[in-house]
């Protein structure tokens, strides 16, 4: 079925929502959040795609930004609404986001596109492009690697989630084919930031709509 990977992942997040929300703070992409702030104008409107329990939305609201968050999981959204009452949250499939064109100054997609199938990603990037204003900034963080897999790990209470892995050049090509201009793109390993974390490589990508 077309949506089996999404339904399975939603079920995992709904099941472990409270435990996941407590663990997630330790995995915040601190340097990336600070850089994203420098790329936006004051009072910018940010779309947080795959906002989860509101960890990053809380940070951006505290910085004075307007934040709209979307997620597949209603249980995570319930936590986000309690945690960040000054942000707005919707349950939406980010393969078919329902907002007017050029609504946002920034799109923050941290560890969210990795739950899609590879063939779905170009369509979603095109939607991000449409939703951003001219000069708007897109941040994407995905796991580096090859292929797709269902993976159970401690962060997800050993329940299996779907992941698609990317190469740097592949992601760069996808963004440029959509029309984005790359600002900066790099990889890092979790253990380089927190020695007690996973030996896991991530790609962080900042790009801009001309």
Regions flagged by a language model, labelled:
Residues 1-41:
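Conserved class I S-adenosyl-L-methionine
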Residues 47, 53-96:
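Class I SAM-dependent methyltransferase SAM/SAH-binding core
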Residues 95-107:
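A short acidic, Gly/Pro-enriched loop at the edge of an enzyme's catalytic core
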Residues 122-134:
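A short glycine-rich, Lys/Arg-flanked "PGG" loop and its adjoining helix->strand segment in the class I
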Residues 135-142:
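Conserved beta-strand signature within the Rossmann-like core of class I S-adenosyl-L-methionine
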Residues 153-169:
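Acceptor-substrate binding/catalytic loop of class I
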Residues 180-191:
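Conserved S-adenosyl-L-methionine
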Residues 191-210:
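Core SAM-dependent methyltransferase catalytic element
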């Amino acid at each position: 079925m077309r949506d089996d990977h999404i339904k399975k992942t939603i079920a995992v997040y709904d099941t472990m929502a409270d435990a996941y929300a407590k663990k997630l703070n330790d995995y915040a992409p601190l340097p990336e959040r600070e850089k994203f702030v420098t790329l936006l104008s004051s009072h910018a409107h940010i779309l947080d795609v795959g906002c989860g329990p509101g960890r990053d939305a809380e940070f951006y609201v505290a910085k004075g930004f307007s934040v709209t968050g979307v997620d597949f999981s209603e249980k995570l959204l319930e936590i986000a609404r309690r945690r960040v009452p000054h942000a707005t949250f919707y349950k939406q499939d980010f393969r078919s986001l329902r907002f007017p064109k050029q609504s946002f100054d920034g799109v923050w997609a941290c560890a969210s596109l990795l739950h899609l199938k590879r063939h779905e990603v170009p369509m979603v990037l095109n939607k991000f492009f449409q939703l951003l204003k001219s000069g708007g900034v897109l941040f994407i963080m995905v796991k580096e690697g090859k292929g797709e897999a269902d993976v159970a790990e401690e962060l997800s209470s050993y329940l299996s989630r779907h992941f698609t892995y990317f190469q740097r050049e592949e992601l760069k090509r996808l963004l440029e084919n959509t029309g984005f201009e790359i600002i900066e793109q790099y990889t890092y390993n979790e253990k380089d930031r927190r020695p007690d974390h996973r030996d896991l490589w991530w790609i962080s990508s900042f790009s801009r709509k001309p």
